[in-house]
């Protein structure tokens, strides 16, 4: 390092130029419009592709959509989905057990993409919690209840996203 460079470094550090540059940047944004959102009171709009709490859907006649193909179970990278199926008298398969462990789930959306009948979907519900570990273990009945309750919202989001699928 030359003497001139070391003198420049000394003067720069002595005059606190980095500190002044930082203060100038802070001053520049101090009086601009605030963009912080106070979350529980204010909510931002969510994309139709947002991946939140899972739900199982039914057909309009009330029959559950899941045909127990187990594609979602096979494609799940976190191994969060467990499915058991039974064969009906007419030869069709339906699930007898469909469980999702949300403590394992990484919300990748592969289950939703792989489903051939749009049975498993991820809703816009992002405010859920559990007081115990078992509270985040969703059974088939719980997932169907979520799907029944939010079917109109799910259908609207699927329709808004249909041209991109």
From Swiss-Prot:
It is a peripheral membrane protein. It comes from the Bacteria. The keyword Repeat applies. [4Fe-4S] cluster 2 binds at residues 76, 105, 108, 111. Its EC number is 7.1.1.-. The keyword Transmembrane helix does not apply. GO terms for cellular component: plasma membrane. SUPFAM superfamilies: 4Fe-4S ferredoxins (SSF54862). One of its GO terms (biological process) is aerobic respiration. GO terms for molecular function: 4 iron, 4 sulfur cluster binding; iron ion binding; NADH:ubiquinone reductase (non-electrogenic) activity; quinone binding. Residues 57-86, 96-125 form the 4Fe-4S ferredoxin-type domain. Binds 2 [4Fe-4S] clusters per subunit. It is found in: Cell inner membrane. NDH-1 is composed of 14 different subunits. Subunits NuoA, H, J, K, L, M, N constitute the membrane sector of the complex. NDH-1 shuttles electrons from NADH, via FMN and iron-sulfur (Fe-S) centers, to quinones in the respiratory chain. The immediate electron acceptor for the enzyme in this species is believed to be ubiquinone. Couples the redox reaction to proton translocation (for every two electrons transferred, four hydrogen ions are translocated across the cytoplasmic membrane), and thus conserves the redox energy in a proton gradient. This is NADH-quinone oxidoreductase subunit I. It comes from Polaromonas naphthalenivorans (strain CJ2).
